[in-house]
Amino acid sequence: MASKALLTKTLERSSYLAARFGLRYFSTTLRFHNKQQNDDSIPWYMRSENTSQPEQIDEPLFEDLPENLPNKVKDLLTLLVAKYGLSGVKVIDLALLPTDHPKSLDRQSEEKIVVIASGKSEKHIYKASYDLKQHIKHDWGFQCAIEGMVTNSMSAVERRRLAKRARQGPPATHNEFGINPNTWVRCELPDGVIVHMMSPERREALDLELMYDESIKFNDDSNGNPYTPYNQYLSQNEKLDQSSIFYGLRREFHTSSTTKKTKTTTTTTTTSSSSPSSPQQQSKSTTLDSVYNDFLQEHGDASADVYKARFDKEFSGNTIDDFNRKFLFYKLLHLKSPTTTSLEDVTSTLLDKYSAVNIISQSDDWNLEIVQDVIKYLELLIDTPVTSIDSSTKLNLLSDFIGKVAMFATDDIHLFAIDKFQVLLWALTTNKVCPITAAHVNSIIESKGQTLRVGGSVASIANTPAGNTTANASVATNSLDTRIIENTQGARDVRELLRSVNYDKRGKMPLWLREQMLFTYAQSRNWVYFWKEWRAITQSLQSPSDFINYFVKTLVLLVMVNDKTALKELLSTYWHRVDDGVCFISEFEKNGKQFEDNNQRLALKTALLLLDEAYPGDLIFRNAQNFASSNL
C-alpha cells in the first residue's frame, strides 16, 4: 500500500511539472515543446542569437615544402600540426645544400631531412613528443631516440640531491638558460628524419635554422682543423688527430724518442683568465723553460739529478704556469729516469697546485684547470715506463686523483663530455698502449701495402710491378710484438660505463670509440668481443663503399696481428655468403667493383697475396688469392 501511494504521488508531481513548464512526460525521456525563439520563457543563454557559431577548421597548409618530399614525411607534418598542435613548422632537405656545406649529405649521412616546430609550453612539448614516440613505435615499427624529453616525476634520489644542492647555495656559474626541461626535444626517426620541438623562446635563442643556412661555411681554427667543442680544453700542441681511430690518444712515449726531439720552447696549458705575469715572473718562466729544453737534449739519465736540483732552485710557484711547467719537467724526468723521479713525485706536482694559496685568485675557472689536469694525469699513467703498475692499479690511481681534485671544483665537472677522456680511459684497460693503431693501418693502405707486417715480418715491396706485388719481396725479421694483456674486469666496467654515458647523451656509441675497442680486442685476442663489435659496426655503415673501406682496414689489422683463426673467419664468413647477409663480394658488386682509390685496391691485393704465401695450401686463403689475381 505504501509503494502504491508513493507511485500515485510521483505521477501527480510529474503532471504538475508538465503543466507548469510545458513538458511532455514519457517513460524514458523529457523534452521541451517547440516554441518560438522570441518566447520569454526560453532563458537568454539558450537563445540562438547568444550561441557562438562553430569555427571552420581548415586542413593544415604547408608552404615552401622541399620538392620530392616523401609521403611519410608529409603525413608526419600533418600529424604534428593537426593532431599535436605544433606551429611554425619548417622543413629543411639537406640534399639541397651545397656540397661544401658542413651539413650537406656529402659530409655527413646521419641527417637527411630536418623538421623544426614550436610548441605552446613545456607541457605541450612533452605531450607532443611522447605521443610522437608512441606513434612511430606502433605505426612505423621503429623505436626512435628522443633527447630532452624529461618526465615531471622525480625520484627520491633526485629530490635528495636537489635539497642538498639548495643548502649549498647557488654555484658561481649559475645560469638558468637551457636548464628547463622540455624546452628543446630532439627526435631521431628512420631514414634520417630529425624532428626538433622547441618552445618559442628557446627557438628564438638557438636559431637552429641558421645552422642549415646555405651561406654557412666551416669554422676552422688557425691550423685548418675543424673546430670541435672539446678542443677548448686542450692546449695548442694537443689538438686531436681526427683522421685516426685513436684520435686523442698519443703515441707511446719512451726514453729513446726523447733524444730525437728538436729544441723548442715548451708550451704549457694555461687558462685564458689567468692574471698577467710581472716581468720578474716572466724571467723565472723563461729560466724554467731553458732548464727543460736543456734536459730534453741530454742523451743519458746520469745528469737527471743535476737538472732536477737546478729546476727546483729556480722554481718559485707564484703562478699557475710555474706549476704546469714543473709537471712537464717532472714527467720528462720520470720518462727518462723513473728511478730519479717516481710516479708519486710527478703526481704531487699536480696536487701541490691546489694547495698553493697564493695562486687561488689567478684563475676564474678552476673547473677548466681540473679537466686539463685530469687529462694530463691520464696521459702520465699511459706513458709511464714502470711496468710493475698494472691496469687495475692505474684505474685506482685515476679514481683517487679525480676524487682529490674534484673537491676544488666550483661546479659540476662533466669529464665524459670530452671525447679525449673516453679514449684515454679505455686505453687504461690494457697493460700497455696498443702497438697497432689506426695510424699504422692508414699508412699501410697509403703505401699500397708495401710495409705490411705478417707474422712479425716486414714485407718490402717497393719497385714491384702492380701485377706482381709479392714477387722479389725482401722479408726482414723486424718483429712487432702485437700482443697486449687486457684487464678483463676493468675493461668490462669501463665498457659498460662508456656505453651507459654515450647512450644517455648521444643515443648510441660513437664509431671511433667502437673502433678503438675493436683494435684492443684484436691485439688482446679477445675474439668473442671482437666479432661482436665488428658486426655492430658493419650494421651501422651506410653505403657499400664504407663497408669495403672498413673491410680492408680490418683485414690489414688481422694480418698484422696474424691470428689464423680470425683471418679464416673474416675470409669465410664475411667474404662471400650465399644468404642475404652482408659480405665483401656482394658489397663490392653493389659498388660497381670500384674502390675508394688505387691505394686501397693494391693494399687489399697485397694482403691477400701475402696470406697465401704465409699459409700455403689452405683453401680459404687460396680462393682469396685467386680473386686478388684475377680481379685486382
UniProtKB/Swiss-Prot annotation:
> Which keywords accompany this UniProt record?
Membrane, Mitochondrion, Mitochondrion inner membrane, Transit peptide
Q: Pfam families annotated for this entry?
A: RsfS (PF02410)
Q: Name one GO cellular component term.
A: mitochondrial inner membrane
Q: Which residues form a coiled coil?
A: none
Q: Where in the cell is it found?
A: Mitochondrion inner membrane
Q: Is the keyword Transferase in the record? A: no
- InterPro entries in alphabetical order: Atp25 (IPR040152), NT_sf (IPR043519)
Q: Where is the transit peptide?
A: 1-26
Asked if the Swiss-Prot or TrEMBL record annotates the protein with the keyword Cell division, the reply is no
The UniProt annotation puts the region (Disordered) at 257-287
Q: Which family does it belong to?
A: Belongs to the ATP25 family.
Q: What does this protein do?
A: Probable mitochondrial mRNA stabilization factor.
User: By what name is this protein known?
Assistant: ATPase synthesis protein 25, mitochondrial
Organism, as annotated: Lodderomyces elongisporus (strain ATCC 11503 / CBS 2605 / JCM 1781 / NBRC 1676 / NRRL YB-4239) (Yeast)
The coding gene here is ATP25
